[in-house]
Amino acid sequence: MMNGLLVIFMAALIFSGAMLANNYIRESADRKRVASDLNLFQNPSMVTNPGEDPYKEVEFPAGILEQLKPFYARNPELVGFITIDGIKDFGYPIVQTDNNDKYYRKNLDLKYSKEGTAFVDYKVDLNAPNQNILIHGHNNKNGLMFGPLEKYNALMYGLDLYKKAPVIKFYGINDVREFKIVGFVVANVKWEDGPTFDFAVTDLSDPAVFNNFKTEVEARTVVNTGYSLEYGDTVMTLHSCCYYFKNVRFLVIARALRPGEDPNVDTNLAKIEFDAVMPDTYVDIYDIGTRAGAYFGNPS
């Protein structure tokens, strides 16, 4: 009997060790790929040998940015590249398809990756005005993809990250746009944790829809950055998981620079909102913030 239990224990130990080793190998490969992609984005001429055209078989969109060519050549579902200066090694290719699940566990080369690929929600029309450009990315608690964004939660980490990294830069196929961050939101997706926020709305052309979105962001943001949303803004929302409790998300909401606006950000305007509207469950666990149920009212 004891010998049988020992065999089972050893088999389980070996299996667990193999799984850990496999996860380590895959994560290491993902880290190398992320570093390689960022390096390639910053140095697109790396792929070019004198006298050679590495893209002679590729049909690029007219006016495509030079930095995007290496990535579009690998995958024509590419729609851009995102960077945030001030967050170490934060730079990722962005794709968009009509299927939000396609890149959940696939990298840009369509190979398995636990990190997946960051993608623009299928509902977004990147060529239309008044859009909320909703970008989904994983947070696997290993510092890759959108994991570092959670450090923007000033209720837990203070304002350090925001002061270093107040701007999102999006390299679209034909242009580069800067987005000033206006808020950070902890959002539950289940009503059992408090009233929810429809952050996934992408068409803000209806003033009533826009005003509701703006009201929610202003009530829920954990930081008043001193910058706000106005009707007609192009909005960007970075969306990822977080682990404060089950089924909760962390959002970074930003808006594009307006015509003639000073691109510089005065981070001294930023203030932590200790009374920010938070999911009820978050307040129950961490004893900070205003319960969303009390602020918005619970459904009957």
Language-model regions: role of each:
Residues L13-S300:
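Solvent-exposed, non-transmembrane regions of membrane-associated and secreted proteins
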Residues M1-F9:
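N-terminal Sec-pathway targeting helices
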